[in-house]
Amino acid sequence: MPIDTPYEDLLRLVTERGTPKSDRTGTGTRSLFGHQMRYDLSAGFPLITTKKVHTKSVIYELLWFLRGDSNVRWLQEHGVTIWDEWASETGDLGPIYGVQWRSWPTPSGEHIDQISSALELLKSDPDSRRNIVSAWNVGEIPQMALPPCHAFFQFYVADGKLSCQLYQRSADLFLGVPFNIASYALLTHMMAAQAGLDVGEFIWTGGDCHIYDNHTEQVALQLSREPRPYPELVLAPRDSIFDYTYEDIAIVNYDPHPAIKAPVAV
């Protein structure tokens, strides 16, 4: 059976048809605006196989978001350094993803736990078209070390299956997007487990989809490789989505090609 490769197809599309553009980092990109990828989560866990993805970082970053944390110290304690380039001397990143997900400030001084609210809505009104979690808090963007790239996501239930669609305003296709796909697929599995649902699709929608000019050789190497079957995800049962630990999450039968290193544009 052929392996669906929407990510690799997007890499190829941007390589062939992308527009050369300058960018904030001064690196330069090849860019395409507006694209969608769909993954059937019942058919396997969408962890890219044409290069090895550091799954430990994916899992710990998501758990860090769910903690409502925005300081890299907890990540560093678990050997994860993916946010270090943007952190202050004290490790702080400002009110980024986790803070907005778990503690969105209101004008009255109260805070909204968007993850808990989304989970409650999945249980009480699964057909709601308002089940959205946003990290794009316009009033607090100046305080953030980096404005949210994956800005907001929506849940959708049909036939007892939970799907999630993410909008990513800025998509570093080679380094960032494989992490983002795996992270939100994992979140969808966790939310489905807590709501008593099966998994449906993860849908990724990108705005500025770009390949940095200093990643072109790495992308060419990746596209020369034959995709392999996706792994499976096994979650231990937990009473709350906030109770999951790294040891509760197992990705089995992951057989990727070797990792490919590339510089991060900061």
Swiss-Prot record:
Pfam families reported in the protein's UniProt record: Thymidylat_synt (PF00303)
UniProt-annotated location(s): Cytoplasm
Pathway: Pyrimidine metabolism; dTTP biosynthesis
Single biological process term from Gene Ontology: methylation
UniProt enzyme class: transferase
GO MF term set: thymidylate synthase activity
Active-site positions on this chain: C149
Reaction(s) catalysed (UniProt annotation): dUMP + (6R)-5,10-methylene-5,6,7,8-tetrahydrofolate = 7,8-dihydrofolate + dTMP
A GO cellular-component term linked to this record: cytosol
Assembly notes: Homodimer.
Protein name per the record: Thymidylate synthase
Species name: Mycolicibacterium smegmatis (strain ATCC 700084 / mc(2)155) (Mycobacterium smegmatis)
